[in-house]
């Protein structure tokens, strides 16, 4: 498998956004500004809450990040949907890490809860993805639960995140 490691740097994640990490048919991450992590610090095929795979990734918060200027004026907060998207990004990244091919698409989430916020004064966001199941048939799909932590406190939880890989995304 191409580039199958337990950690990835920002440069690696940017290579993924260009389609250079998991081969020409592997899934890609979004490019900045939508790339919502700076590094993946742990990836395992076993482990996590269900012993079916685990990812831990981080985003360093800077007070001048693009979303703070528009969400909201005079009340800056990172949009919760960006944290949710980061969890979907990581599920798709994991499918590529396992050797899956195709274009990643978020397929849903059962439940999302927000119990905190990410502010310009925050320092670090950490994502935890616990895989429940991987389906590897005509459609490759990952199902996982996720948590988002800000400066050590869990502030978002998501259950039953789903991402699929499509050989032809026009039929999605």
Curated annotation (Swiss-Prot):
PANTHER family: 3-HYDROXYACYL-[ACYL-CARRIER-PROTEIN] DEHYDRATASE, 3-HYDROXYDECANOYL-[ACYL-CARRIER-PROTEIN] DEHYDRATASE
Function per UniProt: Necessary for the introduction of cis unsaturation into fatty acids. Catalyzes the dehydration of (3R)-3-hydroxydecanoyl-ACP to E-(2)-decenoyl-ACP and then its isomerization to Z-(3)-decenoyl-ACP. Can catalyze the dehydratase reaction for beta-hydroxyacyl-ACPs with saturated chain lengths up to 16:0, being most active on intermediate chain length.
Biochemical pathway: Lipid metabolism; fatty acid biosynthesis
Taxonomic lineage from the root: Bacteria, Pseudomonadati, Pseudomonadota, Gammaproteobacteria, Enterobacterales
Annotated keywords: Cytoplasm, Fatty acid biosynthesis, Fatty acid metabolism, Isomerase, Lipid biosynthesis, Lipid metabolism, Lyase
Superkingdom assignment: Bacteria
A Pfam family annotated for this UniProt entry: FabA
GO molecular function: (3R)-hydroxyacyl-[acyl-carrier-protein] dehydratase activity; trans-2-decenoyl-acyl-carrier-protein isomerase activity
Protein name: 3-hydroxydecanoyl-[acyl-carrier-protein] dehydratase
Complexes and interactors: Homodimer.
Organism: Blochmanniella pennsylvanica (strain BPEN)
Gene that this polypeptide is encoded by: fabA
């Amino acid at each position: 498998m191409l580039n199958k490691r337990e950690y990835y740097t920002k440069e690696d994640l940017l290579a993924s956004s260009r389609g250079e990490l998991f081969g020409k048919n592997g899934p890609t991450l979004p490019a900045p500004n939508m790339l919502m992590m700076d590094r993946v610090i742990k990836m395992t095929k076993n482990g996590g809450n269900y012993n079916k795979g685990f990812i831990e990734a981080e985003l360093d918060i800077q007070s001048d990040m693009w979303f703070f200027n528009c969400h909201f004026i005079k009340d800056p907060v990172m949009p919760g949907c960006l944290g949710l998207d980061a969890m979907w990004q990581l599920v798709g990244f994991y499918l590529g890490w396992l050797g899956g091919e195709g274009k990643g698409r978020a397929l849903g989430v059962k439940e999302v809860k927000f119990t905190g916020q990410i502010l310009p004064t925050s320092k670090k966001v950490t994502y935890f993805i616990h895989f429940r199941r991987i389906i590897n048939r005509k459609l490759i799909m990952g199902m996982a639960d996720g948590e988002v932590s800000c400066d050590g406190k869990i502030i978002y939880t998501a259950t039953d995140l789903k991402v699929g890989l499509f050989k032809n995304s026009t039929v999605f």
